[in-house]
Amino acid sequence: MDRDSSMQAKNLDAQCNPDLKMASANSETLASATHELKIMDVEGGALVDPDHIEEVETSMVIVVDDDDGDVAMVVEEDKHPMRDDPCIEDIMDDEHAPLVAELQSALNNPDDKQASEDPLLEDQEREPDAMSTKTEPSSDAESSHSYHDPMGLLERIEIHDPGDSQDDDDEDDESSNGGGVDGGMRRKMPRAQRWLLWMKRWPWILHEDSDGTLAFCLYCNISINVNNRSRHIQQHNVSLSHQERECNYLAFKKSEEETRGAISDNEIKHEFGTKSYVAAMKQKRISETEAFNNFNWLRWLRWHPWLERSMPTGTIGTCRICSVRMNVEFVYLRKRHETTKGHMEALRNLDSDKRSRKRKRSKSNSVTNSGGDEAEREKESEPEVGPEDAQDTPVVMMNGDVDSGDDPGKWCALIPDTNPQQCRCTLCNCTMAITSFLRHCKTRAHCHMLSTPAEKGSSDIRGIWAVFADMHPWLIADPEDPSIGYCSVCRKRFMYGNSEIKRKNHEKSEKHTLALASAKAGIEVGSADGRGGDNMDEEEAAASDQAQSSQTDDSEDNDDDNWSEIQKLGKGFAHKSSSEPRKATVRAGVRFYPWLCYSKDRKTQICKFCRVRFHNEAAKARHELSARHVKLVKQFKMRQAKLHQGTNTQTKHNAQDDEESQEQDEEYGEEEEDAEEDSQSNFDLGTVQARKTARADNKLFVKPIPATMKGKVMVWKGRFPWLSYKKNEQRGNYAWCKLCEVSLYLPSSKWASKHQRTSRHIRLRIDRKRNGGNPLKTSNKNSGEISTVVATASALASAEARQKAAMAELQAKYDWLDPDANDENHCHCRVCDSRLPIKVFYLRQHDASRKHVENKERQRANAAAAANAPSVSPTSTVDAERQESGMDKESENDMSVRSDGSTAEPLAKRSRRSMEVRRIIRALRDSMGKRQEERSQMDMARDMICSSFDIVTRLRTLERESVAHNESMAQAPPSVTVSPIKPPEPRHVMDLFFDSISPTMKSLPPDLAAEGKSKIMQLVCSLELRAMQRNATTPTPATVSASSKWPSSTTVTPVKTPPAPISAPLASVDADLHSSVVTTPHEYNNGQNNNNDKETVPKEPVTGASSAQVTINGSAKDLPENIRRILTSNQTQVTNRLETDSVRCVPLDKLTTQSRTNVNGRLSQGGTSEAPSTPQADLSNGNTLAMIRQIRVNNNNSSKITVTNTPQMQQPQQAQASITSSTPIMRGGPSSNGCQITTFRTMVNHNRRP
């Protein structure tokens, strides 16, 4: 305790003595203390007198704890750490509260006040005047690392100002280091004490225990989270917003003290009724917010005249010049707005407006007096305005300096009663907004007028616009830019001076009309007063009433700017022209040509008369002087002059001019280019080019545009004979071109002229003339329409004739070429059976191709072989049949998936079928001499459209089953001898017929081709049956004996059939062809009763019979076992195919009905088609017993055959002969009750090709 009290006494002594603000902890003198460094602080450091330093050699440990840990920092006697060092303050802890020597000095309480009182009260250093108003960073940021100097580069302590050190923490740090006696003492500082130190160091901090980690900023009136770290306080202290608010608040407090006097801290606490100084200061700061804001606004409004307060609270203000709202709390925001370009421009305009208004008043007063004293009054008025101008902000031109005596405002004349305010430059005679006058003063045109002032009545006032002087007297050159038009009546720029429509619209506008009327009234008043004649233009003095409208440039402004006129006419121009040293360089304006327009792509300029393109200005100037251009312009003017001769000759001239312009377009090859304005006379729209006559006369000959397209066609068909319309056209403004046969959008006649100049229309018109379709150029409307129709028909006919001639020429060169019936741009190669485009390149390429050559050689070889060989051997025929049957075979999946109505067939099969149809048609063309017979055959082939895919599929299925049974029964010896097949007949015309019809069938769609083949097969089958019925003489059945016997329980019931009518005699096709069928007697009713079960027949040993063999598809095959084993010697019979009693035909139309459905490739049981219940019979030979054949296939795995008894007179020889010459082919169809009925037929073609 004694040591602590001694340390406190030493600290008190150091506190009383200002020279001992900072003491060294070492006993060495200043000269020998090489480790002491200069503290880089704003307040500076204090030099400690060595006589007052206690020599303490022991080191002292100061533990400054923070919330993060309890690590103690040991301060050696050779080091002087600071409390604000981050590495030290982070280890401070408030759990321990030992006595700290520098606490009393930090609280600055030498009078030992009571503990209950606030330690911050009555602190001399907390006076408002003594508060820090610094704007630079505080000392903590610089002193935090000032002691860490291992290189010894910092300066030593030499000079110290006692008044500069205000860092209480540094002072306490040094005093604590120097006041320690016991080196082992540990010093810790609680959190509350640390907040007191921070509040002492930064006067703007207010903190209570209830605030936690938050600190209240007195200057900013906000709470900040410092998180018990001094670096966060330091960061807020150096912010710009805090520093500016600090300046404002200290100024506010100073003004409060001057008006009310200083208030002590106790008075503040008593005022708010609290014992806490911090709480009282917070409440006081909140209560004076409005007063502080008003104080700031007074200062801001005094500093910035352009600023005005827009709201009673807050810091949002408005710029009265720019009318912009902004936040003006901080100085950089206000300075930034002051330096903006818009604010500076508005400020200059405002200053110039003020000066011009004052000068205008002084000038107008001087004009009312006598004319002799005008100069003296001007001199007297100048000194009065001078002081005001000297006080105003000088106007600085952006493009250079301006002389002090040069005031651009003298050329500005305000136009009254305008909002926004408009002004007029009296030098350039142009109107603009008041805010644009300064920019106008910097333009080249204005500078050029200043350097070389032009007289009012100069001949170049119109410039390049002189060509429109007769039509538009008000159009002159713009004073600023002569290349731009200018309306002298409305006093405004006219940007579209080269457009006739724009000039016309402006001349008819209400504004222009009113300005012209007011100008005429002003001229009349001026002439009555004797003031209007002095300003007349020499060029415009001899003009008519239209020319007088351009004289209002000066007379309109005689009332308000006579001072500018006197100055300009008197001494202003001469003085400026003589005293102005600066001359601006003026660039020559771009010359405009009235005949210049743009192309369709809007990229290239062309001459609308000559259709010549331009890429530079020199070419335009040369073209204007060319003889060709001059000639065409004269022709155009002549056509325009003819427009006023009357309505009788108007249509005729327009038609001639139209033809002339079209011929010129064709001559120069620029038909596709479109001019900006039509070269034709679009009199119905009023878009007439520049002409010399008055436009009022032209309005007498303008035809009104009808509202309907029919009316437009009636009006325009004299000029456009190809024009027509559709009665059923629903769209508006759509016409019809009879020559191009297209619909056109024609809102006006200009669009018709555009279409008339298109390349397609011109080409068709040339073709029409070339082929003899010359329309008569008469005014008669009916004759024009008739001639147009005839020309169109002849053009179409000529096109077809040309197509035929070109095809004939190609066929003469390429014998293999055939025209395509569907597309005139393609052809067909009959050798390769391919489709080619009619192009010379492709035709040559195909003719020289290897594939074409090989196909051609193969065709020649086949033709030679067919001509030399009279017959074909049976073996080759059988091989060909076998090869064809192998090619026709398809997989089981394809056949099962295939449906009756499906059209998807294999590509090879479809191509083969179409080739067969083409061969048939080609044979018909070659054999038939007459065209009618040829067309009838083609129609017959096309009408036979039905698919036979189902029939062929089922027949092949039965054939496969037969082959399987024959292979299983191969050990059985054959019992039926098969005679050799007859040699086929030589090739005849029917083969050629089928060869020619195949290409035609190929060209058909797949579904139509399949249906056609089916119908062809159906027709051939019916013809074959009729031929067999006609050629049948007497039945000669052959009985095949078998060793097997029927059981006693089995009975055979003959089936009687009604006689069938005999067909008419027909030409015999294959009279010598014979076929045989295998028939077995059985009950016919079993097939109709849907008995699908196989008959149970007791098996008996075969005693000596051999298996019967038949020819199926050209090959000898054994009879299936299930057929042979149920036949006896007197029941197994092979009948002649020609015998009609053994033939039963099922109509094929019943097999191809649309009501059938496909179930796994077979007919469903619910089909509606029925087969006849009784077979056909022919009683011509006297045979009353009919033979019935019926084969029912059940699930493709079994067959059931029934036979009937035939007379015993049938000869075996005929049966054997007929069996060997036939190929049984089975065809199936549904019975009446839905079961499957399979029939046999023969289709023998000895001349079939592979």
Swiss-Prot record:
Gene Ontology MF annotations: chromatin binding; DNA binding; zinc ion binding
Chain positions covered by the region annotation Disordered:
107-148, 160-186, 343-398, 525-564, 642-684, 851-915, 1032-1060, 1079-1116, 1154-1180, 1205-1236
Question: What residue ranges are annotated as transmembrane?
Answer: none
Residue ranges with Low complexity bias: 543-552, 1032-1055, 1206-1224
Q: What is its main location?
A: nucleus
In terms of InterPro entries, this protein maps to: BESS_motif, Chaperone_stress_response
Q: Which residues carry this modification: Phosphoserine?
A: 165, 175-176, 871, 873, 975
Keyword terms of this UniProt record: DNA-binding, Metal-binding, Nucleus, Phosphoprotein, Repeat, Zinc, Zinc-finger
Record GO biological process:
dosage compensation by hyperactivation of X chromosome; positive regulation of heterochromatin formation; positive regulation of pericentric heterochromatin formation
Composition-biased stretches (Acidic residues)? 164-175, 553-563, 657-679
Signal peptide start-end: none
**Where are the C2H2-type Zn fingers located?**
217-236, 319-343, 425-446, 487-512, 605-629, 737-761, 829-852
Show where the BESS domain sits: 987-1026
The cellular location(s) given in this protein's UniProt record come to: Nucleus
Give residue spans, biased composition: Polar residues: 132-141, 1079-1091, 1104-1114
Question: Quick one: a GO cellular component term?
Answer: heterochromatin
Q: List where Basic and acidic residues composition bias occurs.
A: 343-354, 851-860, 879-897
What domain of life does the native source organism fall in?
Eukaryota
Can you state the subunit structure given in the record?
Interacts with Su(var)39 through the BESS domain.
As for what it does, the entry says: Dose-limiting factor in position-effect variegation, the inactivation in some cells of a gene translocated next to heterochromatin. It could play a role in chromosome condensation.
Entry-linked PANTHER family: DNAJ HOMOLOG SUBFAMILY C MEMBER 21
Its name, as the record gives it, is Protein suppressor of variegation 3-7
The organism is: Drosophila melanogaster (Fruit fly)
